[in-house]
């Protein structure tokens, strides 16, 4: 998918880029796989803001994505490549030979008319899903499960990929996009290939309004707030923080504080941290 560059006809258009959607084959989604989405604007069931900077934006339907890929031995044909407003990756509509329709994350190189299949005996081909134990060392994968049968949780964003490094007993060593090397059960499934739409990260929005269309509201700095709104607020002019370390709006340490649970059981499955060289 290429990038479209706009002429600087206005200040908002200067340096603006967008995808040309050349890979998209239809603009009409499969109706049976759509679910309505209510705009919650970052509020919980009490109406209180639990996630800041959310609200507005274009209305969306949620596309039901098959992250489990558990229809073993049943072949599917790729019918369309579609845009999904709920994620950075594109999605593909597949029709199984038993009549079932499903959406999957569209990997790079997947084309309309291509046949894909899931199961331990599937070929090592883009779009096929297999247990990690059946995938050869060095294979590039995405859509990785962490618990067998739960559905893919890792490597689902546009352009993301991971690589199989080896096998240790019932676990498979996988190097993730971040550089972290992690042990994952060999019975967990993954899909062959890299997630498509890899140029999505190169897009320059050009103006704040495009973020608003996506439902993202402005982020206000704490230093320009009043002292009753933020620990950094108040003072005359550009005042310093006035604390030993920067704080969140709720007074907790910000910037650099480790937030991972020190007793996390998954620590023993992480062979190398993402920030280790």
Swiss-Prot record:
This is Large ribosomal subunit protein uL2. One of the primary rRNA binding proteins. Required for association of the 30S and 50S subunits to form the 70S ribosome, for tRNA binding and peptide bond formation. It has been suggested to have peptidyltransferase activity; this is somewhat controversial. Makes several contacts with the 16S rRNA in the 70S ribosome. NCBIfam families: rplB_bact. InterPro entries: NA-bd_OB-fold (IPR012340), Rib_uL2_dom2 (IPR014722), Ribosomal_uL2 (IPR002171), Ribosomal_uL2_bac/org-type (IPR005880), Ribosomal_uL2_C (IPR022669), Ribosomal_uL2_CS (IPR022671), Ribosomal_uL2_dom3 (IPR014726), Ribosomal_uL2_RNA-bd_dom (IPR022666). One of its GO terms (biological process) is cytoplasmic translation. Residues 222-277 are annotated as: Disordered. Belongs to the universal ribosomal protein uL2 family. GO terms for molecular function: rRNA binding; structural constituent of ribosome; transferase activity. It comes from Streptococcus thermophilus (strain ATCC BAA-250 / LMG 18311). Residues 264-277 have a biased composition (Basic and acidic residues). Coiled coil: none annotated. Pfam families: Ribosomal_L2, Ribosomal_L2_C. Part of the 50S ribosomal subunit. Forms a bridge to the 30S subunit in the 70S ribosome. Keywords: Ribonucleoprotein, Ribosomal protein, RNA-binding, rRNA-binding. One of its GO terms (cellular component) is large ribosomal subunit.
């Amino acid at each position: 998918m290429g990038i479209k560059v706009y002429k600087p006809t206005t200040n908002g258009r200067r340096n603006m880029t967008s995808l040309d959607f050349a890979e998209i084959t239809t603009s009409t989604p499969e109706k049976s796989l759509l679910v309505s989405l209510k705009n919650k604007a970052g509020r919980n069931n009490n109406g209180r803001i639990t996630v800041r900077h959310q609200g507005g934006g274009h209305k969306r339907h949620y596309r039901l994505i098959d992250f489990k890929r558990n229809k073993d031995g049943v072949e599917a044909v790729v019918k369309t490549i579609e845009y999904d407003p709920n994620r950075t990756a594109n999605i593909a509509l597949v029709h199984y030979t038993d009549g079932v329709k499903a959406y999957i994350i569209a990997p790079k190189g997947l084309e309309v008319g291509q046949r894909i299949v899931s199961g331990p005996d599937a070929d090592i081909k883009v779009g096929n899903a297999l247990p990690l134990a059946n995938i050869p060392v060095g294979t590039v994968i995405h859509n990785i499960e962490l618990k067998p049968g739960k559905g893919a949780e890792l490597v689902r964003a546009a352009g993301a990929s991971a690589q199989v490094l080896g096998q240790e007993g019932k676990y498979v060593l996988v190097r993730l996009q971040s550089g972290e090397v992690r042990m994952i059960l060999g019975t967990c499934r993954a899909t062959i290939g890299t997630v498509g739409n890899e140029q999505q990260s190169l897009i320059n929005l050009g103006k704040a309004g495009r973020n608003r269309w996506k439902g993202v509201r402005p982020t206000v700095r704490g230093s320009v707030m009043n002292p009753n709104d933020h620990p950094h607020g108040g003072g005359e002019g550009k005042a310093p923080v006035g604390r030993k370390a920067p704080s969140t709006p709720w007074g907790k340490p910000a910037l650099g504080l480790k937030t991972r649970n020190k007793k996390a059981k998954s620590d023993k499955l992480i062979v190398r941290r993402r920030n280790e060289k």
